[in-house]
Amino acid sequence: MDIIDAFATKNKCYQAAIPLYPQGIMLHSIGTPQPSAAVLARYFDQYQPGGQSVCVHAFVQADGTVYQTLPWETIAWHCGGAANDTHIGVEMTEPSAGMSYAEPAEQITGTYRTAVALFAQLCEMYSLDPLADGVIIGHAEGHRRGVASNHADPELLWNTYGMGFTMDGFRQDVYAEMHKNDEEDDEDMIRYNMIEEVPSWAREEARRLIDRGALQGGTDGRLDLSEDMLRTMIVCQRMIDEAKET
């Protein structure tokens, strides 16, 4: 994902510079056949785009590019309701020829993935739980909650093209994106399942911990002891032994 600074400095919203303390993120789709986030960013870089006081924090497109138009901690006028004061607003671009676009699935899927990556980064940045109630919502969900105007996005876009995407699925995908490195680290972590597998430098102390019942395996007899856990236990044991000697 590539985030490009494209701040809409001419926009009334940017100039107002009202502080935002992000409590969530709202997902939108632009509602017009325009796949270029750069084009949209330029359009919103005017005092009142289309004669309206509107702006979002960012536009995302299918190739992984994000055009950021407002600082994340500035209120955006993106949903016509109270969520403006609590949520970052992000717009997805849409297929260039609307209903007759030759490859809408590729465009929409790419934009969806870019949005997932951005939302995951923002959730990490602001310590937000993507699965918590009301943290990540679509514009339509915001309306049902009474915090946004009456719009049907982004589900309208997904449903129109039969993509099968849902906001529940989006939240799950953001969560998975945030934790994918955890899974990779866990897979790479060295584990010891038998005392014979424990390195010689720690084996004797590990035996003592097992004999004392401080280190126990599962019901199948496997220790399932990670290298990090082993080092921590050995260091603690040695500190205890040194304290006893003094």
Question: What kind of region is each of these model predictions?
Answer:
Residues D2-A8, Q15-P19, P95-D188:
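Basic/polar, cationic surfaces and motifs that engage anionic cell-wall
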Residues M1-N84:
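N-terminal catalytic cores of peptidoglycan-degrading enzymes
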Residues V54-C55, G110-Q121, G169, E197-E204, ...:
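Extracytoplasmic/secreted proteins, especially bacterial periplasmic and envelope-associated proteins
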Residues P71, A120-S127, Y175-H179, I210-A214, ...:
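Sec-exported extracytoplasmic/periplasmic mature domains
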Residues G81-T93:
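Short coil-to-beta-strand
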Residues E184-T246:
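Short, solvent-exposed alpha-helical surface patches in non-cytosolic proteins
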Residues L20, A83, P104-Y112, I195-A202, ...:
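Solvent-exposed, acidic/flexible segments
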